[in-house]
């Protein structure tokens, strides 16, 4: 609980409205709310509106949301209930359509998600739509996957082909890196990368039976090549990405790019790039060079003599996780940025598990399982689902400002920021310091607070969260960059 002057703010309750429990909004004061990227109101006095299903699809494919039937939007954008003549009949019709696979690809709702609410002696229908699990996405309409929708500040929009393909790839049980690329042969591999990998494996696991195999048999054993329909060997996607030469990787992944930038004051913008460095074409070479650079700088700065420390191990895990969970068909590349106070790691592709579950640990659902295994074989990372949880634990034990994880859309990406600033130098209050991923919690709290209060100032956010005025502005500007919030006449409001 965060104590403020005369009132107590329960951050957990505040954020509930924006992380799935949308029914926490105060429906008895519905006029306070406005339509936004998480709330949609429809009058529905003439029956179920056709646009209801576009909103259902968009909420399911984005972050979830709440649909209010029997609620009218006035000219001033305020919401007001109208009396639905027969809400039970509408709900019955709703379930008939929701369970009709010719209309809706999948029903992700439980019966508790749809109910009648009485407001001002008027009956409305509340439909709480969760974010669909990756196996169910995309949620589409009328039997056509091209009728898949997403939600942004402007409302529901039809997904692009790239967005649809990304969701389809993530929905498959077999991960995309297991695919055999029959248009290519083993000539795509960089033999220097492969031999460096084999030497590293022999150092980590000296008695591994794989060390006695020929290169061809070794590649097959680790899943880097496979037999195609022509009964010949071809590289797998994992093998191509891990050991391939960049010109061949880009034939399969046109947007493929790996980049590391160091902008510290004592380093004149060091850049390691798959486009610029011939010795850094693939995932393996990039990982080795970037990790060596990062770990050396950290040991030098902190006067650490050992090569292996909890922090360097956590950084190794973070960098490997980024490469393992990237969607290499995405339009944005892998970017690692280092400055004087932090390292930021970003990869294309959204979350495959809920963020809270990833932070708690124990659930493993990597986007590229074959690549993960290749890293595991040289002692990097684990497949127990505790990678993110372990990183948070290390940062907390070293009393550093806790990591920040953010998910962005259009294009989809995940960003992890690892700060090396001690908690004692942070402006966070002690109670907030102990909360995991507090930056994300704060953004969620701000969205919910604006939902309740329509417009806010940065000063109000500062007082709400107990942070500096400068920090509150930073949070608001991040939400503006994500297209969730806009500023009007010096006040912030949710984008309509």
What are these regions (language model features)?
Residues 436-456, 463:
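Short amphipathic alpha-helical interface segments
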Residues 307, 435-436:
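Short basic coil micro-motifs at the edges of alpha-helical modules that engage polyanionic partners
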Residues 1-312, 317-424, 428-430, 456-458, ...:
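Conserved N-terminal catalytic/coupling substructures associated with nucleotide/phosphate chemistry
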Residues 415, 490-496:
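Minor-groove-contacting beta-hairpin "wing" of winged helix-turn-helix DNA-binding domains
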Residues 480-490:
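A short, conserved structural fragment
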Residues 462, 471:
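Acidic, carboxylate-rich catalytic segments that either coordinate divalent cations
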Residues 430-433, 496:
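Long, low-complexity, charge-rich intrinsically disordered regions
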């Amino acid at each position: 609980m965060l104590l403020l002057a005369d009132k107590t703010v329960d951050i957990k309750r505040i954020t509930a409205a924006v992380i799935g429990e949308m029914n926490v909004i105060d429906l008895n004061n519905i006029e306070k709310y406005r339509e936004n990227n998480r709330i949609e109101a429809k009058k529905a006095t003439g029956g179920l509106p056709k646009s209801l299903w576009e909103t259902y699809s968009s909420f399911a494919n984005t972050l979830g949301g709440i649909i209010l039937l029997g609620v009218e939007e006035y000219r001033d954008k305020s919401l007001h209930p109208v009396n639905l003549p027969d809400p039970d009949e509408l709900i019955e019709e709703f379930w008939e359509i929701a369970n009709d696979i010719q209309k809706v690809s999948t029903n992700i709702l439980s019966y508790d998600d749809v109910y009648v609410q009485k407001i001002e002696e008027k009956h409305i229908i509340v439909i709480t739509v969760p974010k669909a699990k990756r196996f169910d996405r995309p949620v589409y309409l009328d039997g056509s996957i091209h009728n898949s929708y997403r939600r942004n500040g402007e409302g529901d929009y039809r997904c692009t082909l790239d967005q649809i393909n990304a969701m389809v790839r993530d929905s498959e049980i077999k991960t995309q890196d297991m695919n055999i690329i029959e248009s290519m042969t083993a000539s795509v591999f960089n033999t220097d990368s492969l031999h460096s990998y084999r030497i590293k494996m022999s150092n980590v696991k000296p008695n591994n039976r794989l060390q006695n195999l020929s290169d061809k048999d070794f590649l097959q054993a680790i899943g880097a090549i496979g037999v195609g329909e022509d009964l010949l060997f071809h590289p797998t996607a994992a093998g191509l990405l891990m050991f391939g030469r960049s010109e061949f990787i880009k034939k399969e992944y046109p947007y493929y790019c790996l980049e590391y930038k160091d902008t510290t004051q004592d380093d004149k913008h060091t850049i390691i790039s798959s486009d610029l460095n011939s010795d850094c074409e693939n995932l393996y070479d990039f990982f080795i060079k970037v990790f060596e650079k990062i770990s050396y700088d950290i040991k030098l700065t902190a006067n650490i003599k050992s090569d292996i420390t909890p922090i360097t191990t956590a950084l190794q895990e973070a960098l490997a996780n980024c490469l393992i969970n990237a969607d290499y068909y995405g339009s944005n590349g892998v970017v690692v940025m280092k400055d004087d106070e932090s390292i930021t790691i970003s990869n294309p592709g959204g979350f495959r598990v809920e963020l809270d579950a990833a932070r708690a640990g124990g659930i493993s659902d990597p986007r590229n399982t074959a690549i993960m295994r290749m890293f595991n074989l040289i002692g990097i990372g684990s497949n127990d689902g505790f990678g993110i949880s372990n990183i948070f634990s290390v940062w907390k034990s070293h009393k550093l400002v806790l990591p920040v994880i953010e998910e962005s859309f259009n294009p989809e990406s995940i960003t992890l920021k690892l700060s090396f600033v001690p908690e004692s130098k942070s402006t966070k209050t002690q109670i907030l310091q102990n909360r995991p991923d507090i930056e994300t919690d704060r953004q969620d709290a701000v969205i919910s607070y604006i939902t309740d209060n329509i417009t806010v100032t940065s000063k109000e956010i500062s007082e709400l969260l107990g942070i500096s005025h400068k920090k509150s502005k930073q949070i608001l500007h991040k939400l503006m960059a994500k297209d969730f919030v806009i500023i009007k006449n010096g006040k912030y409001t949710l984008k309509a």
